[in-house]
Every structure is written in structure tokens, then in C-alpha cells.
Amino acid sequence: PGRGETILVVDDEPSVRMLVVDLLEDLGYHVLDAEDGAGGLALLQSGARIDLLITDVGLPGMMNGRQMADAARVARPELKVLFITGYAETALLDNGQLGPDMAILTKPFSIDTMAQRVRDMVARHG
């Protein structure tokens, strides 16, 4: 279970975002959320504690999830990122070229799979 870590969830689909937020809160994490890259980046560039970013790759607007994560890592180089992606969006991740402490969870996924992936990533230290 979470030990008070803070996770930022960015997804433009309210139903998906709420499902993930509810799951993470049930697991004991503190959760922040945003519906697009600009909102997510604003939180990431604030002073808020964020231990893990979970973002959909395909976000509306000027910035997709990968671009937001890359921009956030300028200010937070140690940021851990879990990308949620549909098969068609995998190309946005540069053919799977991910930096350290980045991982992909492909839709559709089970609650148990997501919970385990989050636990593994949050537990990994630096």
C-alpha cells in the first residue's frame, strides 16, 4: 500500500481519470489530477510533491503525454512516468524508446496490473 506518496494522473477521459484516481486513493496514495498536458505540466512545475506521473499518451491540445513528461523532466529529472497507451498511440513514444524510470501500460489493462505496476515504480528509488 501507499505510504503517502503523491501521484499525478493526467487523462482527458473523465471516466478513466476517475477510475485511476479512485484506485490509487484506495491503495493509500495522495492523488492530483489534470485533464490535459498544460494542466499536468502546471502541477509538475509547481512546488507540489509528485512521486509518479501517470499519463495518457494521447492528450488533446498542444502537448501529448510524452511531450509533457519530457518538459516536466527538465525541472524534475528524477520524475518517474507511467504512460497509459492504446495500441495506436505507441508511435508517439518514439517506437518505445523510453528514458530511465519510464514504463508503458497498454489499454485495456486490469486494475490489478495497474496497481502492481504503480507499486513497483513508486518503490524504486533513484
Residue positions per predicted region:
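Alpha2 helix of the CheY-like receiver
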Residues: 17, 38-45, 70, 115
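Two-component His->Asp phosphorelay active-site signatures
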Residues: 12-14, 110
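Charged docking surfaces used in two-component/phosphorelay signaling
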Residues: 18-26
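The feature encodes the CheY-like receiver
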Residues: 17, 60-62
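Active-site residues of response regulator receiver
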Residues: 56-57
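Acidic, metal-coordinating helix/loop segments flanking the phosphotransfer/catalytic sites
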Residues: 8, 32-52, 92-93
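Acidic di-acidic motifs
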Residues: 5, 11-12
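Alpha4 helix (beta4-alpha4-beta5 surface) of REC/receiver domains from two-component response regulators
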Residues: 63-74, 78-107, 111-120
